[in-house]
Structures are given as C-alpha cells and as structure tokens.
C-alpha cells in the first residue's frame, strides 16, 4: 500500500512561529511531525508516499529528501493555494499516487501501532473507503464529527451529534476517487467527498484509534515538547 501525506498547510493559528517555518516540520518530542508520520507509515507497510506541499514547500522537501532516510520512496506534488484536503489528494493522484492508499496529514501523530492497525483493518475490510475515528481529542469546531453504525460511517456531522471525531486519517479506494471531483468550494474537502460517497451507496468503514497529538497553537508547541507541562495544566 502507498500513501498521500498532506503537508501544504501554513498553520495560521501557530503564528508567528509559522511565519518562518511550515507547520509540518515543527516538532513533537523534538522531532519533525511529518517525519514521525512517515516513519509510522513505513511501519504500517507503506513503502511509497506522495507528499503534497505548498506553504514554504522547499523547507518540507529539503527535510524529507527522497525518503530514503525513512525507508519510503517519496514523490512530491505542489498545492499552490490552500484549496482543501480533497484538492490536495487529487493533486497527489495526478502526480502518480495509486489507490488503494492511505491519506494522512503531515501534522498529526498517532499512538504507536495505531496507523498500522488502521492500514491492516482497511485492507481486510475491502471497502471503498475508511475513516479513522477517535474520542480524544473530541469533536469540536475544527474537528468533524462522525456518526457510526456497526463499524460503518453513516454521516459526517456537526460535533454535537456524536462522541467521535475524525482522526485525520482516511483509506481511499479506487471506487471513491470519482467523488473527489465536482465538490462545492474552494475549499474542497475530503469530508464532503466521503459524505457524497456514502450518500451514493458506498460503504465507508470506521476504525477507532487512540488519542492523537497535533499542533494547533503555540501552547501546543510547548506542551508537546515538554510533557511535564502538559501534566500540570
């Protein structure tokens, strides 16, 4: 299996830090987040990945190189404008990525083994798509809620209607790729594409993962690198 890693965003809420460095290369536990994501993808069996870059793209591409340091063959696609996650994935596919594949963000770190378990579950399920769901962090203004019935996504909804948030990880099969086109926007978002696929009768599996770690604001940047501060908040 291969992957698309979305690493084009600026991280506006992390300003002024991201005025100098793009969000995906900022650290968690002292290591660049996007590098941690690539290592987890390799552990999940992904030996090829397309990294979609945009804001300060050269810094991300210089850090990752050809991927040999992570055991992953890398290619790059550029997203010149922040036109959304579905647009980023479409650009990755146009650059040569082939479904079925995983779609991950370059700024979210999963619990050890969770990404590999998700990849294995998606492959075993054989469904056109899959969504990772989590209870922690819970749904909120920046995190889509997901309604689930017996392991299948039924709706991607407002946060108040479900205990599950989407966990920034998707499984994308070939049957689902046409739903990336014709979305309302910009921005063009994967949540809308998957909802259209569900409404069109496609089965989207849901797999729960543990708490995730990401960088939303400068306070996160401090707490995720000095964990004793997180315990005292």
Residue ranges and their predicted role:
Residues 9, 63-66, 143-154:
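Acidic-glycine-rich active-site phosphate/pyrophosphate-binding loop
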Residues 129-146:
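Short beta-strand-to-loop element that shapes/binds the nucleotide-sugar donor at the catalytic cleft/hinge
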Residues 102, 109, 116-119, 123, ...:
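Catalytic-core segments of class I nucleotidyltransferases/pyrophosphorylases
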Residues 1-19, 202:
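N-terminal nucleotide-binding beta1-loop-alpha1 segment
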Residues 2-5, 13, 27, 31-105, ...:
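Conserved N-terminal catalytic core of the sugar/cofactor nucleotidyltransferase
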Residues 25, 145-148, 206:
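A structural signal for short hydrophobic beta-strand segments in well-ordered beta-sheet cores
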Residues 54, 77-79, 132, 159, ...:
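Conserved beta-strand termini and adjacent loop/short-helix elements that scaffold enzyme active sites
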Residues 10, 21, 56, 211:
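A generic "binding-loop/recognition-motif" signal
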């Amino acid at each position: 299996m291969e992957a698309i890693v979305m690493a084009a965003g600026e991280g506006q809420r992390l300003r002024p830090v991201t005025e100098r460095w793009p969000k995906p290369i900022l650290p968690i536990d002292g290591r660049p987040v996007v590098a941690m994501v690539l290592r987890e993808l390799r552990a999940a069996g992904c030996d090829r990945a397309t990294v979609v870059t945009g804001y300060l793209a050269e810094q991300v591409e210089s850090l990752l190189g050809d991927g040999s340091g992570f055991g992953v063959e890398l290619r790059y696609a550029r997203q010149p404008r922040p036109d959304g996650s579905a647009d980023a994935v479409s650009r990755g596919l146009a650059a040569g990525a082939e479904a079925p594949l995983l779609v991950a963000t370059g700024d979210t770190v999963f619990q050890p083994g969770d990404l590999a378990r998700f990849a294995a579950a998606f492959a075993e399920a054989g469904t056109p798509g899959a969504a990772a769901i989590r209870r922690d962090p819970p749904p909120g203004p920046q995190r889509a809620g997901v309604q689930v019935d017996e392991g299948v996504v039924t709706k991607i909804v407002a946060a108040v209607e479900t205990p599950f948030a989407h966990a920034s990880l998707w499984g994308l099969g070939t049957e689902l790729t046409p739903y990336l086109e014709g979305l309302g926007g910009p921005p063009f978002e994967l949540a809308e594409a998957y909802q259209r696929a569900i409404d069109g009768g496609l089965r989207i599996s849901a797999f729960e993962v543990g708490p995730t770690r990401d960088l939303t604001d400068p306070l996160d940047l401090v707490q995720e690198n000095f964990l004793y501060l997180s315990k005292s908040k």
